[in-house]
């Protein structure tokens, strides 16, 4: 699942260059900016893709989302996949939700 590939990079388990052949356009630069901060790395439980879904606005394009869970914390991740002339799907954009919600939010 593509969301798991993104999670591996954004949690620091894989280097950003692992996505070179799986991105197009600005998506790789977005990952280069995000990855060093490891925004999906957590202490304790490893983050996992809890659910994933998508919408097909037109053939060859998927606007996808995933919820990433680590213990009681949940983060949102959105990404756009585009199918190339070679029929391979590549990531064209990545976006992360705001602050983690869950246990830390419950204390507020």
PLM features: residue spans?
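Surface-exposed, charged secondary-structure patches
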Residues: 40-75
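Short beta-strand edge/turn micro-motifs at domain boundaries
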Residues: 76-108
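Core segments of small alpha/beta cavity-forming domains
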Residues: 1-41
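Surface-exposed loop/turn and secondary-structure junction residues enriched for glycine/proline
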Residues: 31-34, 52, 99
